């Protein structure tokens, strides 16, 4: 096995000795005068919200009214039923097999959310969608109207 990189010193032993002499000149083995680097501090990302489908803003840039509206929307989304995808015993049932938002097949055990129109989506996909537009991506039925009417009948 050869080394394709040319070096002025072709002898591995001489490279090893050079490395040891470099360390000795830097005072290895003694306490360095430098402090160790500060620990890595992970910055918490600022959430990005979509007050309307065409706008994207950081949470810190929203007005109080927009923050209230987003909090209400999140509250409504949390009231939508969620579950786990189960295609059935034989898997041949006429069930939806693909999330139309991400175009990925559902896999047994995937977290899903049910909309009042009976369409299902991956939980993360539909939650993100509903933060932008409160309509079903398949049939365009308003989700909030169906949610509010279901509260009135109970």
UniProtKB/Swiss-Prot annotation:
It comes from Homo sapiens. A lipid is attached at residue 4 (S-palmitoyl cysteine). This is RING finger protein 11. A lipid is attached at residue 2 (N-myristoyl glycine). Residues 41-51 have a biased composition (Low complexity). Gene3D superfamilies: Zinc/RING finger domain, C3HC4 (zinc finger). A zinc finger (RING-type) spans 99-140. Changing residue 4 to S: Change in subcellular location: Becomes partially cytosolic and retained in association with the Golgi apparatus. Partial reduction of ubiquitination.
